[in-house]
């Protein structure tokens, strides 16, 4: 491929990628953090260029031994998502190579794919936690990263497909320049992190259904979550995989991934 053609191809690819992000169904993913964070709490400008060289993989690797809460389909069937590793791509600084597993009931499927950061927003007013616990802990800034994900299940498994959509995560950076998973407001009833909003599509393209997940709360989950202080599944959906969760909240003894 000539240098001119290669440059043209790269330009088209970047334009297409940006267009896909812009046209993704107009979802304000920040709204899923309300009332923890509101859009008005964030600086208008994106700080992507400023933080591009930082490694944000910690926000996805923080819960390596745990699973996210999630659902798939209109009847809120429980799906478990476990990120085993997220590694920053040295050549594409916005991209992270991801490996993990998904499970519906006891059917476990490995997946791999990418997280791509598109925007980085900074909080205009810092949050310090209960009784300002973190106020003097050397925190330089707090923010939200927003991006896209594409995760491909192993094709060797029956009824496999791929997940795609928008992602977001709360983070903070220390005075020493370290990126951290933001759990400062963990004691808040509205706390959540790592919100994923999107779809699952079968490889044969016969099915495309809604599938969302997150840490501690699930974004855009309708009447599934009826909990006040923490996530609690609606009794209406217990038969869709949530009965074991309601009996053993943290799923330590019955972790299907072990």
Q: Where do the language-model regions lie?
A:
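Bacterial N-terminal signal peptides that target proteins for export
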Residues: 1-9
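Central antiparallel beta-sheet cores of small beta-barrel/beta-sandwich binding domains
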Residues: 27-222, 226-258
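Short, linear, compositionally biased motifs with a strong N-terminal bias
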Residues: 13-14
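N-terminal signal peptide c-region/cleavage motif recognized by signal peptidases
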Residues: 17-18
């Amino acid at each position: 491929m000539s240098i001119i053609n290669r440059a043209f191809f790269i330009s088209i690819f970047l334009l297409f990628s940006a267009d896909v992000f812009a046209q993704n169904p107009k979802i304000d993913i920040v709204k899923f953090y309300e009332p923890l964070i509101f859009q008005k709490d964030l600086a208008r400008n994106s700080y992507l260029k400023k933080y591009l060289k930082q490694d944000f993989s910690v926000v996805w690797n923080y819960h390596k031994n745990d699973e996210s809460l999630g659902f798939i389909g209109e009847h809120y069937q429980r799906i478990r998502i476990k990120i085993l590793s997220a590694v920053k791509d040295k050549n594409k600084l916005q991209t992270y190579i991801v490996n993990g597993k998904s499970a519906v009931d006891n059917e476990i499927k490995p997946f791999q794919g990418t997280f791509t950061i598109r925007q980085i927003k900074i909080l205009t007013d810092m949050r310090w936690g209960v009784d300002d616990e973190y106020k003097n802990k050397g925190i330089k800034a707090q923010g939200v990263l927003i991006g896209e994900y594409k995760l491909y299940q192993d094709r060797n498994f029956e009824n496999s497909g791929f997940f795609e959509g928008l992602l977001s995560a709360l983070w903070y950076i220390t005075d020493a320049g370290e990126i951290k998973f933001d759990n400062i407001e963990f004691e808040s009833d509205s706390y959540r992190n790592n919100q994923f909003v999107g779809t699952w599509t079968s490889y044969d393209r016969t099915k495309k259904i809604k599938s969302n997940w997150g840490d501690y709360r699930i974004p855009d989950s309708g009447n599934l979550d009826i909990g006040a202080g923490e996530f609690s599944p609606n009794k209406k959906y217990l038969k869709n995989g949530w009965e074991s969760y309601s009996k053993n909240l943290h799923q330590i003894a019955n972790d299907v991934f072990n």
